[in-house]
């Protein structure tokens, strides 16, 4: 709250419009006066941060969205030198990033279940779901389809949105909107050197305009990694922290017809030898993800009141890991998840202009999945071999409708419902409702209610290898209820503020726990109830001189109960009670460069209980990250970005998932509570566009 008051005080000291015209494409002046010209540019830039498309599959303003939403603009992405989507959203109120050296995962409002891989967050790229069909994984770091150079803005939508999207929109949605041809150079290339993440090179092209365009991009990353020490795993330092990724895309549209093809391949090594790997091996573990997303569709305005859109899509995913074992041949896991689907939706304005509207649609997806685990040399399925082979095909159908209206200037509402049928898991009905009371463009309140669900993935519901994981038993859908009140205000030009009070209750959450019949194996179980409630505030401020600032904090209380016990608060693994972020960026100093600084605070967190004694593990201390960036845009066609991450050099002790526990010897089991986060990193990026 102090942050909001401070920004408000700064705003009253300088009531000028809130954007630096030099950071935006040139626009015609509104008049001959400089102030009017700046105001015209301000209006254009403000629309970028005030419009949301991912919360209801249509454009809405922030004041009329049935969620608490933050939009990370392209200008903010460039100024602060974010290198991945994960870095960009880690500075958003209530959001934190967890890199446990297996994957990059995102926590929201204190909820990040160890061993989860963003499966409770729906990730969209230009409206298409990235979550794959085998494990429901969605990458947001280097393990994703999208280069940060392609991103126009990122929408962070908190809370369940199953009433529109069905499964996976559980804790929230990350909607990545890429740059269109009109805002992309005809051709561009960028390369960077990073002291931990190695070399990153990307290039792309764009032709056409708003209604007819073709654009594409490529990105390659070769990570150097670090040498690290985890005494619980090995007495000596461990290397083998590298990774390699490749991503490419082609996107096009012609009038109302659109299509996109995106693909990536990502390999990550882990020096910490998960799944009882041999820590003395030079490369004890690596995993490879490969994914292809194809989508095409058409949108047509049938009448001024009726718009219809249809799309078809395919999402093809493959996973493989390789575990070097002590005293035996290596062990391999393979997973495959291919999904094919189609959606038809429409919007009809019952009362115009925008007084009452109905959005409705139907969607069907077919999933073909396969899992296989084997010791090398024995890869045949039974009865001819010892491999664990699990084929499973299923389909999901959904139908949804949402009514929204604004009976008066100051009052609006939304109410929606979706029914989903999973042919092998569960059927769910997901409602949401919202009431909006506002003085338009000045201040308002939103009262929000939503229910959501998440089906266990094919990996959770059916996978086993009898080496690290035992067979799951009768898993069912997770459910969540959300209550939230949002106060928002734009007290002066350039200043936006939000204060939220929230209560989330998630039940039947699938957790990765020791098998009650064999503690040396992990098993997926519908064991958990998680409750999170608290306050969240954020603010952003721009001036016409080019200053930009943002900040936020979340104070939450998170509780957990397993198998029907009473909810206990304070000792939930990976659940910080306090999150904070702050960023300030200068105008172009000397007309050349922006200087930006950012701070991220991650509160103290509990780790998992000791595997043997059941006693609480050591707590992870609070962590403060400081970053600095200098950004020189369009210097004779060149862009230059230089920065330093984690200036203090203090590593966050990341809460470790059960994958790292040493359980091969039942008489000498070791719980790995924490693994080190990244240290200080320097980077330099140079690009050219024409």
Model regions and ranges:
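Extracytoplasmic beta-strand/coil segments of soluble accessory domains associated
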Residues: 54, 86-132
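Gram-negative outer-membrane beta-barrel transporters
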Residues: 406-413, 501-505, 525-610, 689
């Amino acid at each position: 709250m102090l942050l909001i008051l401070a920004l408000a005080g700064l705003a009253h000291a300088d009531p000028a419009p809130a954007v630096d015209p030099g950071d935006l494409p040139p626009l015609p002046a509104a008049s001959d006066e400089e102030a009017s010209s700046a105001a015209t540019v301000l209006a254009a830039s403000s629309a970028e941060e005030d419009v949301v498309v991912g919360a209801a599959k249509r454009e809405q303003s922030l004041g009329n969205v049935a969620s608490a939403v933050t939009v990370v603009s392209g200008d903010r992405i460039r100024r602060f030198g974010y290198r991945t989507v994960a870095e960009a959203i880690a500075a958003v109120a209530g959001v934190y990033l967890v890199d446990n050296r297996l994957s990059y995962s995102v926590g929201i409002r204190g909820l990040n279940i160890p061993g989860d891989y963003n499966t409770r967050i729906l990730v969209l790229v230009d409206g298409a779901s990235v979550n794959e069909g085998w494990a429901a994984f969605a990458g947001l770091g280097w393990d994703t389809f999208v280069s940060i150079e392609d991103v126009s803005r990122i929408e962070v939508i908190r809370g369940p949105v199953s009433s529109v999207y069905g499964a996976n929109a559980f804790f929230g949605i990350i909607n990545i909107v890429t740059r269109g041809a009109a805002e992309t150079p005809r051709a561009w290339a960028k390369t960077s050197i990073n002291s931990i993440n190695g070399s990153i090179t990307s290039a792309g092209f764009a032709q056409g305009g708003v209604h007819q365009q073709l654009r594409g991009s490529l990105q390659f990353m070769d990570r150097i990694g670090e040498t690290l020490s985890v005494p619980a795993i090995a007495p000596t330092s461990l290397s083998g922290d590298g990774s390699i990724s490749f991503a490419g895309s082609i996107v096009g549209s012609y009038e109302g017809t659109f299509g996109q093809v995106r693909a990536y391949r990502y390999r990550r090594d882990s020096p910490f030898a998960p799944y009882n790997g041999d820590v003395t091996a030079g490369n004890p573990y690596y995993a490879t993800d490969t994914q292809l997303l194809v989508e095409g569709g058409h949108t047509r305005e049938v009448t001024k009141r009726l718009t219809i859109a249809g799309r078809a899509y395919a999402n093809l995913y493959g996973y493989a890991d390789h575990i070097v074992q002590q005293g035996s041949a290596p062990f391999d896991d393979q997973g495959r998840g291919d999904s094919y689907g189609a959606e038809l939706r429409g919007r009809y304005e019952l009362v115009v202009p925008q007084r009452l509207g109905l959005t409705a649609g139907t969607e069907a997806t077919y999933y073909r999945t396969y899992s296989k685990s084997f010791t090398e040399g024995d890869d045949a399925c039974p009865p001819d071999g010892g491999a664990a082979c699990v084929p499973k095909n299923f389909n999901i159908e959904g139908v949804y409708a949402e009514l929204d209206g604004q009976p008066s200037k100051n009052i609006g509402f939304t109410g929606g419902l979706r029914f989903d049928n999973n042919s092998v898991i569960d059927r769910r009905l997901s409602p949401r409702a919202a009431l909006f009371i506002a003085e338009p463009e000045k201040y308002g309140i939103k009262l929000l209610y939503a229910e959501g669900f998440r089906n266990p993935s094919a990996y959770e519901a059916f996978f086993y290898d009898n080496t690290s994981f035992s067979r799951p038993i009768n898993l069912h859908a997770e459910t969540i209820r959300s209550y939230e009140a949002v106060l928002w205000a734009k007290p002066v030009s350039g200043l936006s503020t939000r204060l939220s009070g929230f209560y989330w209750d998630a039940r039947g959450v699938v957790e990765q726990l020791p098998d009650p019949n064999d503690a040396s194996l992990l098993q997926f179980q519908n064991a958990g109830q998680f409750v999170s409630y608290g306050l969240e505030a954020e603010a952003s401020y721009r001036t016409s001189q080019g200053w930009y600032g943002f900040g936020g904090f979340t104070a939450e209380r998170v509780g957990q109960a397993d198998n029907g016990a009473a909810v206990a608060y304070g000792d939930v693994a990976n659940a910080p009670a306090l999150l904070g972020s702050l960023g300030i960026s200068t105008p172009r100093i000397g007309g050349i460069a922006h200087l930006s600084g950012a701070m991220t605070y991650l509160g103290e967190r509990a780790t998992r209980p000791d595997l043997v004694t059941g006693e609480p593990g050591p707590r992870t201390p609070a962590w403060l990250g400081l970053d600095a960036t200098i950004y020189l845009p369009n210097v004779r066609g060149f862009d230059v970005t230089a920065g330093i991450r984690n200036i203090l050099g203090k590593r966050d002790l990341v809460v470790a998932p059960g994958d790292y526990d040493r359980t091969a010897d039942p008489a000498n089991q070791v719980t790995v509570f924490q693994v080190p986060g990244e240290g200080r990193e320097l980077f330099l990026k140079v690009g050219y566009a024409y």
